[in-house]
Amino acid sequence: MGTSALPGLDRLLEVCGRLGLQQSVLPPGKHPPEPFAPVAGTPLDPALASFYSRMGKAILAADADGLVIFQVDDGINQLEAENNALRAGWQGDYFAPLFVFGGRPLLAHYFATVPNWSDPSGFQPVVRVDTYERPYALPIASTVDRLFDTYSHYLEELVAHEDFNADGAAALSFPWKVPHLLARDERLVQLIREGSFDALMTDADARAWSGEVLNAHSRL
């Protein structure tokens, strides 16, 4: 089965290069996972399969904010290991409907797809999960590649922010301070309106923030 193009990833790599941000990328394995192949009991999102056909792992913009995509190659399957570990842990019930594929460097923040809400082509929406104390999620993209695209625009705004040199990512935290960027994602907005993520947004601030995304969309 063929893999799909990833224009969002291409833009993210271009932005990192243009802004002089760190990029650490490992080559793909000889036998990358196919779209919809079972990984930790979950069909692999086709955009993630496309990513792993190009790279075995990526750490992008760690000197600004940081996006890590877990390692999968001929020697390591971090997707399998991380998802199995999280589902077996004390927060396992929360992670059961999610498929974690990355996170932020050195923080208990994960990026995960929500397989139950995949679109007709099988592409899964993405949430950011905060696991400090009681876990909660923020819906951030309709697909994995849309996350890459949105994150690339976020990095441009972050680096241009007047407080970036002094405060780093705290000057414009992702995704809390950029609901206007997520509001451009029409399918994400539709899923939020339909209540698809309500069970995952266990935090009152998360629910209020999702309302900010909807308000930002109404102003487009």
Task: Indicate where each model-derived feature is located.
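A surface-exposed partner-binding patch
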Residues: 1-112, 182, 187-188, 194-220
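Long, low-complexity, intrinsically disordered segments enriched in glycines and aromatic residues
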Residues: 56-177
